[in-house]
Amino acid sequence: MASIVVVGLQWGDEGKGKIVDWLSVSADAVVRFQGGNNAGHTVVADGRVYKLSLLPTSVLRQNKLSMIGSGVALDPYALVREVDSLKDSGIFLDPDSLCLSESCPLVLSVHRDADSIMEEMRGNESIGTTCMGIGPCYEDKVGRRAIRLCDLLDETSLYDKVLCLLSYHNLLRRATNRREVTPHEIMDELTQIAPKVLPFMKPVPEIIVSLIKQGKTVLFEGAQGALLDIDHGTYPYVTSSNTVAGYVRVGCGVGALGDMRVLGLAKAYTTRVGNGPFATEQTGTVGDAMFERGREVGTVTNRVRRCGWFDAVSVRQAALSSGASEMVITKLDVLDTIDEIKVCTKYRCGEESYDYLPAASHIQNRLEPVYETLPGWRTSTLGAVSRSDLPENAVSYISRLEELVGVPVSLVSTGPERNHIVPMNP
């Protein structure tokens, strides 16, 4: 059975949680392979809203194995809070249903502090980070001073690693007139949480390989979107990890995954949280309508999302960087009330024309979209579950997106509930 990868093709918030939840019915295990608790997934099941940030969406399904790979920046306190919150909903996780990679770098209080300090220092050039410490945690990982989950097993060696970590972080704190953090503070932070997270620690790569050899279906759940990828996104307004499908092998520690079915998700329009270029952004009535109908507020941060028309140029490039074999269009119903719908087919910048997204930020900031206008359908698609439920103009719109992006659309999401999904090629 082929592995399934679900990734975003925009700036995140494409509805990956809902699609992973829907696909996980036929999967045996779901793995998060990058990001941290700065990314949120919302799933509506039987009228109840579940908001997840670290845990794979499969925790909402019975008898599914959920795993977190080493590519994830793991905030142990955030993880425990999330596990505890699910208990209130009658969902109980144990080491047989949730596995954490031994190599996960841990997000600590000093990382959140560093995130806030650096964002403050950027002033008007701020990136719009969530200040949850994800970026500084990844910096420490690359700098070979991160505390990893497996380090919690031995307090003696852990103390030496904490000293190394603080020798770096206290430099920043001294330079910005902040109080230095003592090793005992970090040791207390870690030793208190260790008994709650260590029971979940398992050799995740070995488990994944074993499942694949048994012919089981493993689903890999991405966070954020390709346009936020540290290498392929709208740098520097990006996240601190690789969000494209190719990172699955690195973030899980398994090189031989066999055939991969890559589903790239995109909203029927575009949204973005935080700062950065956004060529198709709409700040008037259209953007307001998308915001209100789409309820475009961040799951984790409650920040308002910027809204605009579908950008086929950037989505095509994102599909290319992730090797998307299928596309999933979400929130089609948000466009139900719009008379004419625009799609960006190329960019202009001065005398130049671009059919791709240039890497240079000074060009990205000046790009002007060239639009193609398509007729709306002015009919409700909310809750549609079959292709025949969709108006002709809605089907034509989806077909045009397929042509422009160059990837077939296999699923269309038409509402918040987990069953509001239209298979386009049943």
UniProtKB/Swiss-Prot annotation:
Annotated EC: 6.3.4.4
Keywords: Cytoplasm, GTP-binding, Ligase, Magnesium, Metal-binding, Nucleotide-binding, Purine biosynthesis
Binding site for Mg(2+): 13, 40
Signal sequence, start to end: none
Known pathway: Purine metabolism; AMP biosynthesis via de novo pathway; AMP from IMP: step 1/2
Keyword Metal-binding carried by entry: yes
Cofactor binding remark: Binds 1 Mg(2+) ion per subunit.
Cofactor(s) of this protein: Mg(2+)
Classification via PANTHER family: ADENYLOSUCCINATE SYNTHETASE (PTHR11846:SF0)
Protein name: Adenylosuccinate synthetase
The encoding gene: purA
